[in-house]
Amino acid sequence: DAFMVLSRIIASFHNEKGELMIEGLTSTDMQVTELEESFLKKMLGSDEINLFDTESISKRLWLEPALDVLAIDAPPVKEAVNLVIPKASAKISLRLPPTEDPEHAMKMLEDHVMKNIPWNAFVKFIPNSKGSGVVADPNKPFTKELVNSFNSIWENDTAYIGVGGSIPFANDFVREFPNAELVLVGAADEELGNAHAPNESVQIDHIEMLIESLVQTLKNIS
């Protein structure tokens, strides 16, 4: 049954603690703000989420590879009948820390899939799009000036988080303009941000403060 084969392969990606079981993948070593468990559960909308006694939530969230199943093609529930399923497929997303080579990661993912095929079933691995990430240096002049503006306008210390580094165009920018600084900033609703979702939300006052910070920084360096 193709669905059972697919289920076994998907189950092989993680162990009982939710740790990724694909051999050969690497993590990124850098300093980021440590998220508190209570904040993360509030952000995810549930106090019942099992975080598996993770040593560092921030490292696992931002600096290690993560895999999820985006979609599965198989008979829908409404059309299901009591027959053996002849074929099934899934689209897998493997999010990488910015220092991981996507070519290497794709090969490791394929090797894992092919090593975990049950019952001598026929399985085809089809690579899709991939992109390289980048690590932005927070100690460069423009970045430090921008952080000073953030601190002043928000009246709070800036926290560094590990997001955006796997966006492929960021690496393209660094490659094309090696002497330029890369700073990834954005505005979001702290309670209802829902990035990438249909109901993604931003706080208007945060957008205004972000613009003010950028303007102040440009004035300071001009």
Language model features with spans:
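Structural beta->alpha junctions
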Residues: 96-100
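Active-site helix-to-loop segments that bind/position phosphate- or nucleotide-bearing substrates
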Residues: 92
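A short core secondary-structure module
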Residues: 1-18
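Generic solvent-exposed, charged/amphipathic alpha-helical segments
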Residues: 7, 11, 110-114, 147
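An extended, acidic, His-containing surface patch that forms the Zn2+-binding/catalytic region
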Residues: 20-79, 83-87, 102-108, 116, ...
